[in-house]
């Protein structure tokens, strides 16, 4: 039995060797070999080739082709007037008028005399006349004047110039009936309209005078005159630029308007009511 088994294995070995040889020999094929590395897409290659085939842009100047380097165009005036819509023309007129009004805007170039009540009272007592308050309203100067009641017949006037005192005009003040009878002071009011076309290089000034029993009393703002200036030409007064030293000032226990105006300008003293007319 052992011999038979050996023979069987021997007879079967050659086919195994033949199959091994067939596996080692690769079959030849006519198809081209494909690379194992993936190449660029065909569409991308075609785009690159098209870009290379395109002609590059070039810059050329007009003079190299016999043309002029500059071009001049001449426009003639319109034969017919340009028609502007009504709303636009009205807007332009309003802008021009607004600019003119801003240029002719005036302001008072002095401090209201009644802002400092103690000084106002002393001036009235010494000069017998003093401007109380005034304001500019619709290109008109309006205000009040206080005078001492020296006699029944009185004449109070405003002397005003619009051309730096080359000429001047006197304007009458009207008597204002006092609420309290028997007062030793009288009140007069005035309303002076400012003329049109005032020159920008001239000064507008005024003073107050009071005639009584053949005597004349003047209030010329301590010989400085009361000035009206254009808003862009206004010069700050010494009163506005004055600095108060709180250490050197004593507080008035009775709440004097002088003290309140100097240290506490936000408090509602007489300085805040200078446009309301007489206050006594």
UniProtKB/Swiss-Prot annotation:
Single Gene Ontology BP annotation: regulation of glycogen catabolic process
Short sequence motif named PP1-binding motif, residue ranges: 58-61
Alphabetical list of Gene3D superfamilies matching this protein: Carbohydrate binding type-21 domain
CBM21 domain: residues covered: 121-229
Pfam families linked: CBM_21
PROSITE patterns: CBM21
GO MF terms held by the record: glycogen binding; protein phosphatase 1 binding; protein phosphatase regulator activity
GO CC, alphabetical: protein phosphatase type 1 complex
Keyword Heme belongs to the record: no
Keywords for the protein's UniProt record, in alphabetical order: Carbohydrate metabolism, Glycogen metabolism
Quaternary state and interactors: Interacts with glycogen, PPP1CC catalytic subunit of PP1 and PYGL. Associates with glycogen particles. Forms complexes with debranching enzyme, glycogen phosphorylase, glycogen synthase and phosphorylase kinase which is necessary for its regulation of PP1 activity.
Protein task: Acts as a glycogen-targeting subunit for phosphatase PP1. Facilitates interaction of the PP1 with enzymes of the glycogen metabolism and regulates its activity. Suppresses the rate at which PP1 dephosphorylates (inactivates) glycogen phosphorylase and enhances the rate at which it activates glycogen synthase and therefore limits glycogen breakdown.
Domain text: The N-terminal region is required for binding to PP1, the central region is required for binding to glycogen and the C-terminal region is required for binding to PYGL.
This protein's name: Protein phosphatase 1 regulatory subunit 3B-A
Lineage, opening ranks: Eukaryota, Metazoa, Chordata, Craniata, Vertebrata
